[in-house]
Amino acid sequence: MQARADAAELTGERILQAAVDIFWERPSVQISLEDVAERAGVSSRTVIRRYGSKENLLASAAEWAGAGVAQQRGQAPVGDVPGSVSVLMDHYEEYGDRVVRLLAAEVEVPALSDIADKGREVHMAWCKRVFAPYLDAASAVQRRRRLAQFVALCDVYTWKLLRRDAGLSRRQAELALVEMLSPLTKES
């Protein structure tokens, strides 16, 4: 009985991983159940039986992938700028190019906006948590501005500018980001 439950769980994970992989290859809501089934090594009926619809599959896959991202980024130590930047760089080295493609596709495929918006929410919450010690500014206006600065500097586009456009090594890009964040973490 346990072996059967374990096999069913593994099948579900293979299906979700297939959906996530296909999505990142070509960010679109036009993912076919047949492609997902083929990639996962199961029948289309298995995918439908398990998730009911393409919409449910995509929602489940997004939630499943999001949990992995949250776990990865959750390792960032609060108040430790170099440590947090290292975790952020790990994340962007794995997902950065994909996220940039998603954000570009969002313009053409408005249905992707929900996924992009969720990513923005996760990023904002991460910045609030990680940089909490530096958000104790004197006023709400200052806190809001400082948070916006952290969000912008730690954005995937900053990673792209440093790594892809400027051609910096990961180590140099990480150092550059720490240097850019440094003035925001000093008392004025």
What are these regions (language model features)?
Residues R50-Y51, S60, A176:
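Residues in the recognition helix of alpha-helical DNA-binding motifs
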Residues D35-E38, V151-V156:
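Short acidic alpha-helix initiation/capping motifs at coil-to-helix transition points
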Residues M1-R39, S44, R49, E55-N56:
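Basic, helix-initiating cap at the start of DNA-binding domains
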Residues A8, A40, S44, V78-P82, ...:
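Alpha-helical bundle regulatory/interaction domains
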Residues S86-D90, E94, P110-A148, C154, ...:
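Amphipathic alpha-helical packing segments from all-alpha helical-bundle domains
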Residues R14, A18-R26, Q72, R98, ...:
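Solvent-exposed, amphipathic alpha-helical segments
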Residues D21-E25, I31, N56-V87:
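Amphipathic alpha-helical linker/stalk segments
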Residues Y51, A104-V109, L153:
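Short helix-capping/turn signature of helix-turn-helix
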